[in-house]
């Protein structure tokens, strides 16, 4: 992994300077997500169709991230790691996720947790 050990600030500088693209970061994040999934079953969902975003001055712009599965993410399976919600796909975004998305961050996976995060 070439970029995943760098800080958000370091990644943002590389993005701003054109030394790396958001697409490259997404691809590396997805590759790592699949490797971790095979070994640890750490994700409810891996978003292989995550899209590159335009880079802005916001430090989160173009940065891939994972979100706990108890956050509602519009159009993406959000189970709370519970069989009760095993097919739940929300029609809205949780405020915290919406703020990350509006800042230009790119969700690449939903992480497993104890049922309902309890």
Regions found by a protein language model. Give the residues of each.
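Nucleotide-cofactor and metal-assisted catalytic machinery
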Residues: 100
């Amino acid at each position: 992994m070439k970029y995943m050990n760098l800080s958000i600030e370091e990644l943002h500088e590389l993005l701003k300077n054109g030394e790396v693209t958001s697409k490259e970061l997404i691809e590396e994040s997805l590759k790592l997500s699949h490797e971790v999934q095979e070994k640890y079953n750490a994700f409810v969902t891996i978003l292989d169709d995550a899209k590159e975003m335009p880079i802005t001055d916001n430090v989160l712009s173009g940065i891939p991230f994972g979100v706990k599965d108890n956050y509602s993410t519009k159009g993406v399976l959000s189970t709370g790691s519970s069989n009760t919600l095993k097919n739940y796909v929300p029609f809205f975004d949780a405020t915290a996720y919406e703020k990350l998305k509006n800042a230009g961050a790119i969700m690449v996976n939903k992480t497993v947790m104890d049922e309902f995060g309890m």
